[in-house]
Regions:
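N-terminal, positively charged nucleic-acid-binding surface of large information/translation enzymes
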Residues: 1-144
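A ubiquitous short alpha-helical element
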Residues: 7, 271, 290, 353-359, ...
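Hydrophobic packing residues in well-ordered alpha-helices of helical domains and bundles
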Residues: 13, 46, 359, 366, ...
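Structural signal for well-ordered, non-membrane alpha-helices
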Residues: 21-24, 50, 54, 332, ...
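Structured secondary-structure scaffolds
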Residues: 35-36, 41-45, 111-344, 379, ...
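Generic hydrophobic alpha-helical segments
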Residues: 50, 141, 159, 372-373
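A glycine-rich phosphate-binding loop feature that marks nucleotide/adenosyl-phosphate handling sites
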Residues: 66-71, 265-269, 317-319, 351-360
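Acidic, turn-prone loop/beta-hairpin segments
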Residues: 349-374
């Protein structure tokens, strides 16, 4: 993106960080710590993870082929390479992943790979990089995945299949001009730690940053080291490989840190049968929705059509219907009637000496709803939880 706009990478980082922050605030979403993976704290945590994995024998150096653009005379990051997916034959697969079938890839696996910089066929040159030894870490993941039968089927089935097929060692450094420096000097300054490895470490570094800001530098340990602490990773299905296998592999290799409790990945939101994507011009951007709808209407509609088990279609007509029939006519009407009664009769209502049968039944129903809906929330079945809330 920086190359496309003719600016420095840090300018792109700052631009989108600011935009995302603005979007979340407009959607009334709050947080304890909103940060980036550009902080000194994050770099320190990444270096600590890297060195510990190196000491534990889960990182080593290997020679490999990396995509190279002969026109621009530079090595290409994986996402600067596009071609046909060798598994599903999708024509616009990237060098690290296919958006169509969610397979993780290496650039040399693509059929007819081309450079996104020049549009010319990519060449492959030998270079040396640090690799995460997933071939060893897979042994730690198999028994752990067997305990995750409560995960969504498409997540656990994919993760088990990925590990069962045999994990390949994966390069965690690249010939890049911009990124986090490698904490050892073996390969020179022209190589950096690659984003797919260090980005997921942001969950841990953000927690450590939050602890420092709270005044208790060890507070993060309560959430990452105590056995009873739980962690849930809410992602899209294109990120399943990184959160169900690769991040757990890093945690297992490091040791002393909790593995994910659940990875409730959603499938895709579709617009006229196509995956919603602002970058590809499919569907509206969040900015467009925010300019036309109130935050509650957006959040309610998205929660109503969450693609928890399969892809879901989102249409303008559906947003209008749910807003008018459910939020306004049903929920809004109930709230309006209740508040009107309270406003008009607040001085006439006395505390009863005892509850009538109808009152007791209503309270029992409320208790039942709280328990039933809570079970759905704990199981991360949020769409059903919302449906049951509206039904009650």
């Amino acid at each position: 993106r920086a190359d496309e706009e003719g600016v420095e990478p840090i300018d792109i980082v700052n631009k989108y960080h600011s935009e995302f922050l603005d979007y979340w605030e407009k959607l009334s979403i709050s947080w304890d710590n909103y940060t980036t993976t550009m902080t000194d704290n994050h770099k320190e945590v990444v270096h600590d993870i890297f060195l510990k994995l190196l000491d534990n024998g889960f990182i080593d150096k290997q020679k490999t082929l990396q995509a190279f653009d002969p026109i621009d005379n530079k090595f290409l990051p994986d996402r600067y390479v596009e071609g046909q997916c060798p598994k599903c034959e999708y024509g616009e697969a990237r060098g690290d992943q296919c958006d169509n079938c969610s397979s993780t890839l290496d650039p040399e696996e693509l059929i007819n790979p081309v450079s996104k910089l020049s549009g010319n066929p990519a060449e492959f040159k030998e270079t040396e990089h640090f690799f995460l030894k997933l071939s060893l870490l897979g042994e730690k993941l198999s028994p752990w995945l067997e305990t995750k039968e409560n995960w969504r089927p498409h997540v656990i089935n994919w993760a088990k299949s990925f590990v069962k097929d045999g994990l390949k060692d994966r390069a965690i450094t690249r010939d890049l001009e911009w990124g986090i420096d490698i904490p050892v000097d073996d390969l020179g300054d022209e190589k950096k730690i690659y984003v797919w490895f260090e980005a997921v470490i942001g969950y841990l570094s953000a927690s450590i940053e939050w602890a420092k800001n709270s005044g208790d530098e060890d507070a993060w340990k309560e959430w990452w080291q105590k056995e009873e602490a739980e962690s849930y990773y809410f992602i899209g299905k294109d990120n399943v490989p990184f959160h169900s296998v690769i991040w757990p592999a890093i945690l297992a290799g490091y040791g002393q840190l909790n593995m994910p409790t659940n990875v409730p990945a959603n499938q895709y939101i579709l617009v006229k049968g196509q995956k919603a994507s602002a970058s590809r011009g499919v569907g509206k951007s969040l900015a467009d929705y925010l300019s036309e709808w109130e935050p509650d209407a957006i959040r309610y509609t998205l929660a109503s059509v969450l693609p928890e088990q399969s892809d879901s279609e989102l249409t303008e007509e559906e947003m209008v219907r749910r807003n008018n029939e459910e939020l306004v006519a049903t929920w809004g009407n109930l709230v309006q009637r209740v508040f009107t009664q309270i406003q008009n009769n607040k001085d006439a209502i006395k505390t009863p000496s005892s509850l009538e049968t109808v009152d007791e039944e209503l309270l029992k129903e409320a208790d039942k709803a709280f328990i039933e809906i809570g079970k759905y929330i704990e199981a991360v079945e949020l769409k059903t939880a919302l449906q049951e809330s509206m039904r009650y």
